[in-house]
Amino acid sequence: VAGIKVAVVGAGNVGQEVAKRFQAFGAETTGFDIHTNETVGFDHMALTETLRECVGEFDVVVVTAPLLPSTRGLISREVLMAMQQDAVLVNIARGGLIDQQAMYEVLSERKDLFAALDVFENEPLTADNPLWKLENVAVSPHNSFVSNGNNKRMFAVMYQNLKTLIEHQK
């Protein structure tokens, strides 16, 4: 992992946690966000609208963005085709962020790419879905959030959110 370049598409809390873990192993991280150009927990920041032009610079692309009308299909055929040789795409956010048909077609054409997918447009992934047949795809059943210490982190976030809500109501 040391020395690789990682694009994290979605620079919110989840994206920052992903970046922190990659940075711990010596990776260089770039956060892509639609709202800001400020570095927050990343080595670099970029606007999401520039993703297609610079996605070819990254060894790994991790999708952590929220699904909004403006982000639906964000990872398009053009973005996928622009990924560098032997790149890895990871989606732990929402299936609708990736154009599912385009992803299947590109992964069928480009055996050098690899996708690790925890989420899909329609879940669970049906037994006849063609993604199951691709050797360059790993599928998990929407459980990437399961990890040691996750409950503690979730309760800390809930506590902080409740505290903020109460303080704003005073």
Predicted features by range, described:
Residues 1-17:
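Glycine-rich NAD(P)-binding loop of Rossmann-like domains
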Residues 5, 27-28:
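Residues at the starts of beta-strands that form the adenosine-phosphate
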Residues 19, 23, 107-108:
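Gly/Ala-rich phosphate-binding loop of Rossmann-like dinucleotide-binding domains
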Residues 25, 41, 133-135:
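Short, structured coil segments at secondary-structure junctions
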Residues 33:
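Conserved acidic E/D residue at the C-terminus of a beta-strand in Rossmann-like folds
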Residues 36-130:
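Rossmann-like adenosine-cofactor binding region
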Residues 123-170:
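C-terminal helix-to-coil terminal segments
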